[in-house]
A protein has these predicted regions:
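Active-site phosphate-binding/coordination module
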Residues: 23-121
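Asp-based phosphoryl-transfer active-site loop
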Residues: 3-18
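Short, acidic loop-to-helix structural element flanking the phosphoryl-transfer center
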Residues: 18-37, 80-87, 129-132, 188-199, ...
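Mg2+-dependent phosphoryl-transfer enzymes with acidic/Ser/Thr/Gly-rich catalytic loops
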Residues: 1-4, 22, 182-268
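Conserved acidic, metal-coordinating active-site core of Asp-based
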Residues: 94, 99-211, 215-223
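Short active-site oxyanion
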Residues: 36-40, 59-61, 146-147, 206-207, ...
Length: 268
């Protein structure tokens, strides 16, 4: 019997950068909880964006935010992995070489962007993602930072390789959706965060389902026997997944979850 479901959000349940979700997900999450199945949303987003997205069922879920940097529920934070301050400052210096990219730094409960960022970027993070983000004059005197997210125009060449390679072994750099490259502490990932939840609930790999579509979902998918990706996901993710559902636009994950409810939590 399945005891825990963990799912990515952007590109898996919703269009990247939006909070428009099929309300049937709320119904099926409620039904899963009635069957005793726990549900976790795992995302590069910060916690308040996830809480807003899942508002009707927020009190019934776990939330893995900031690509594994924070684990919590609607009422409390369970785990935080802050970045090393010295490494963070060096990363911020390196990012100055990319004038077409914009930074969003996330603490456990708040995010920050520089004053003067383009209005489109500010609208994206505050209105589309619904991040609780504050403008700051500089990066000084901020609370401990969990994640540095680098946004780039999806119409431009993806800077992931150039950004990530120099930091390999010192920070974890991951592609998070079409427009973001995220940096978190070494060893931090959705997979590590999911493992923390699995151990606390005493859930095995055979008792969990995981859904994802991007490279940052692979560590999480490795924790589960029943790993799924959606049609339209990256080919590397399809190759790693045990199953491929219908595309996100066709609510492929919802179809799987409905069948699981129909079968009383048994996956066949």
């Amino acid at each position: 019997m399945i005891k825990l479901i963990a799912t990515d959000v952007d590109g898996t349940l919703v269009e990247d950068g939006t909070c428009r979700i099929n309300p049937e997900y709320f119904t099926v999450i409620q039904q899963l909880r009635e069957l005793g199945i726990q549900v976790a949303a795992a995302s590069g987003r910060q916690a308040d964006s996830l809480l807003s997205l899942f508002e009707p069922v927020r009190d019934k879920m776990f939330f893995i935010s900031n690509n594994g940097g924070v684990i919590g529920t609607s009422s409390r934070i369970l785990f935080v992995a802050n970045m090393d301050e010295t490494l963070l400052q060096k990363l911020l210096e390196d990012c100055k070489a990319f004038p077409d990219c914009y930074l969003l730094l996330s603490a456990a409960e708040e995010s920050y962007y520089l004053e003067g960022c383009p209005e489109d970027f500010v609208h994206l993070i505050t209105e589309e993602y619904r991040f609780g983000a504050e403008p700051v004059k500089d990066w000084k005197s901020l609370p401990p930072i969990v994640k540095a997210a680098i946004y780039h125009d999806p119409a431009l060449p993806h800077p992931a390789r150039v950004l990530i390679e120099p930091w390999r072994g010192r920070l974890t750099g991951v592609v998070s959706g079409r427009e973001w490259v995220d940096f978190i502490g070494p060893g931090v990932s959705k997979g590590r965060a999911l493992r923390e939840i699995m151990e606390s609930l005493e859930v095995s790999a055979e008792e969990i389902m995981v859904f994802g579509d991007q490279m940052n979902d692979l560590p999480m998918m490795e924790q589960a026997k029943h790993s799924f990706t959606v049609g339209g996901a990256r080919e590397e993710v399809k190759a790693a997944a045990a199953h491929v559902t219908a595309p996100m636009q066709e609510d492929g994950v919802l179809q799987v979850l409905k069948n699981l409810v129909k079968n009383k939590g048994e996956f066949t």
